[in-house]
């Protein structure tokens, strides 16, 4: 931040797709997390397929998900907090399954939030089901290309195989 290292201290929503998450994605909730728990980063976990996920839901529900993301981004800006927009895969396991939707989603998000330096993009959380790093890496290059067109300095987080446990694979072949 302004040339200085930042230590992120954060918490993740459990999935903005669930109605039970509604009370927790708003300015008051984020302010409480910041003031009472010392949180400076909020991860907006949006499932892609599970729980009426972004890739499988109807247009009206998709608009609600985008509105929740926007609420978190605006609250984060006002409160001086970082916000991670998380493409949360679970049963889909392999991020390539919804690659075209991910590319369109992150193109939209990175264009909308390109001036919001407190916004980070997590383009595939916890790949699983035996997907290999080379597959994730190929997916990541494709999605990141679109993000970089909007914001060449955006922070992008890429999950690794086995629910993001195999970080050594990414370290060996970034």
Predicted regions and their residues:
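Intrinsic structural disorder
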Residues: 1, 5-7, 93, 121, ...
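N-terminal carbohydrate-binding accessory modules
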Residues: 1-43, 56-59
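Extracellular glycoside hydrolase catalytic/binding regions
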Residues: 15, 22, 82, 99-120, ...
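Substrate-binding cleft and catalytic face of glycoside hydrolase catalytic domains
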Residues: 30-113, 117-119, 123-129
